Amino acid sequence: MELAMVNLSEGNGSDPEPPAPESRPLFGIGVENFITLVVFGLIFAMGVLGNSLVITVLARSKPGKPRSTTNLFILNLSIADLAYLLFCIPFQATVYALPTWVLGAFICKFIHYFFTVSMLVSIFTLAAMSVDRYVAIVHSRRSSSLRVSRNALLGVGFIWALSIAMASPVAYHQRLFHRDSNQTFCWEQWPNKLHKKAYVVCTFVFGYLLPLLLICFCYAKVLNHLHKKLKNMSKKSEASKKKTAQTVLVVVVVFGISWLPHHVVHLWAEFGAFPLTPASFFFRITAHCLAYSNSSVNPIIYAFLSENFRKAYKQVFKCHVCDESPRSETKENKSRMDTPPSTNCTHV
């Protein structure tokens, strides 16, 4: 589901949209829309760069050495975020830049559908990562048999299949509508309003609330276990496990904050009288931008909280400079620079 599908100023509801707060035009569009487009542009640029860098770092593991389950889940999260940024934000930006929908029926269905798929893949992947951390720390003796690449890949496949299935009603009910004023809008239309209410509730419960509760449960167990076992762990092992848990926990908290306003808007619009005021307009736009920004903040979190990722980032740039260095370098330097980064560099 997409914020623009509710009866909001983007015009994707079942009734004529109310006018947004009056503002002076700037470059042919309203000031609010112009600012929103600038924010979209920043989110897009930061997200594409950051997620591409994360994918590059994780892809440069030593040949023949299996990737950690944590890294596979992070890789899946980055791929979903990057695909969303590339396939959704540029098209959705036209809603703010143009007075009518010009991209056709397929794009209308696809961007709203993939928006929901990406949201679900993200939360389900974060839930899987929390379970992975729980098994690694609380059940460390059994984790070696459970936390293998094969199981992680099966989990990733299941996450995508479940997300694609859960988002299918969005693609089915998203339609183009034409007005007498020669304007076209990409709207969501459900023949039965009760079905739409049920879908909104199910998406909130199964695509937000329950995964967050599972995540909270796993991290409560992890923190309790670390507190009890603190004295029996080596300082290096203790610091490594705490840092990994901290990184994933921050990613989860940011996700929860980023998507909560989105769900509040949808539930409010379906079950209450959503006010059409300048304040509510600002809240909707803020919810919209927060939801989009979640796809670009995870690489920043890795960079600030994970020392191993920072080292891996530097290694990527170092190898890039190395590849473009003159061939007249000594054999010793060339051999050292051409060595691929160790897999340990990418273990968050």
UniProtKB/Swiss-Prot annotation:
Sequence segments annotated as region (Disordered): 328-348
Family: Belongs to the G-protein coupled receptor 1 family.
Keywords for this protein: Cell membrane, Disulfide bond, G-protein coupled receptor, Glycoprotein, Lipoprotein, Membrane, Palmitate, Receptor, Transducer, Transmembrane, Transmembrane helix
Residues in the Extracellular compartment per record: 1-34, 92-109, 173-197, 269-270
Quaternary context: Interacts with GRP39 AND HTR1A.
Tissue expression from the record: Expression is detected in brain, spinal cord, heart and skeletal muscle.
One of the protein's GO biological processes: positive regulation of cytosolic calcium ion concentration
Designated name of the protein: Galanin receptor type 1
Classification via PANTHER family: GALANIN RECEPTOR 1, LEUCOKININ RECEPTOR-RELATED
Pfam families: 7tm_1
Role description: Receptor for the hormone galanin. The activity of this receptor is mediated by G proteins that inhibit adenylate cyclase activity.
Compositional bias segments (type: Basic and acidic residues): 328-337
Cellular compartment(s): Cell membrane
Domain of life per record: Eukaryota
Glycosylation sites: 7, 12, 182
Lipid modification (S-palmitoyl cysteine), residues: 319
GO molecular function, one term: galanin receptor activity
GO cellular component, one term: plasma membrane
Cytoplasmic domain ranges by topology: 56-70, 132-151, 219-247, 292-348
Membrane topology of this protein: Multi-pass membrane protein
SMART domains: 7TM_GPCR_Srsx (SM01381)
Parts of the chain that traverse the membrane: 35-55, 71-91, 110-131, 152-172, 198-218, 248-268, 271-291
Disulfide bonds: 108-186
Source organism per UniProt: Mus musculus (Mouse)
PTM field: Three cysteine residues are found in the C-terminus, at least one of which may be palmitoylated.
